[in-house]
Amino acid sequence: MSNSSNRSKEYDTVHHITSRIAHKVRFLQEEAERNDLIEMIRRAAVFTGVKLLGWCIMINHFHILAFLPAPIEVDEKEILRRYGVLKGAKGAATLEEQLSKLRLEGETGCKEAERLLDVQRKRMYSIGEFVKIVKQWFSEEYNRRNSHTGTLWEGAYHDRVVAYCHKDIVECLGYIHLNPIRAAACATFDGYAWSSYSAFKKGDEVAIDGMRFVYSQKTEDERELALYEIAEMHEELLANLLEKWKLRRAEEIARKRAAGQAAPIDPLTTEAMVAQAEEHIAEVRAASMELHERRTRAGSVKERHVAIEQEIISSIELYPGIRSEQLIDILGVSKSGLYRFLAKLRKSGAIEQEGKGGGWHKSILGKQV
């Protein structure tokens, strides 16, 4: 099962897939298990026709970025080839022998052979089947090796369709590749062996192909980007995303401390960053009081709504990159109410967001409400 929307059934779409081990148990602690899972992800991708763009296998969950292309005609020869990648040469030989025997039985047998081929075709070009193959295989292998019984995976996997634009896709891949850094599992961007970025730096063809897809834009002289240029661009992206994450983490610590909760510094933050976040929170709260007083002077509901929209734009101008939760603090409106105002302003072209869940900026078009 998946909690993805119906959009995940559309073709020519990019998907961010995540799945967690049940109860956050570290079943992927052993290096061999992570290696085997990556190998099955590769094999399942070949069989289903899904294109791997990136991956990261952590000790209790995994991330995959994949492209689902439009289906192509798959004849018997191609089915057997893909089945061989998935099940091995012996598995493909067994299927081929089964088909041959059925065809010796006449018309009825030929129809049954075609039915079996159609069963395999229907498993292709499907994100759901791709994930099912990966998770089912890993469960069976893990249980067999470790005499384990019971649930291994934490319910449904999560499948988010990523907007088909360069900025959103590269940022999603960057988020995936930052997982080991945020978890203190490595100190460098390419230092985690079970990340596709590490594989890319080591010359892995699948990882290189995925990165080329993500960084598919041309240079000014219309040539394809060299691998070192892709690496430079990606590491610059990772550095920027990591800095934003550090600042967000410092703000979380500052908020907890302001609420009287214990919040120790972690490896990626400093007391100086937390102090800066505390100053920012104080400024935001002061601005909130001022805006609240301005709103109370407004008359009708329509006038108050216009005032709130203007406050949102003013706050975004004052704090470029401000996030939705910070706007809630400033404006003192409900989460659902804020989202309605943000949706209206974004639709009008007055504001824009840095990808899904990112900070807000005034639109380059500068449209006013």
Question: Where do the PLM segments sit?
Answer:
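Short Pro-Cys-Gly-centered "Cys-loop" motif that presents a nucleophilic cysteine in a tight turn
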Residues: 1-59, 67-355, 364-369
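Charged, glycine-enriched surface loops/patches
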Residues: 360
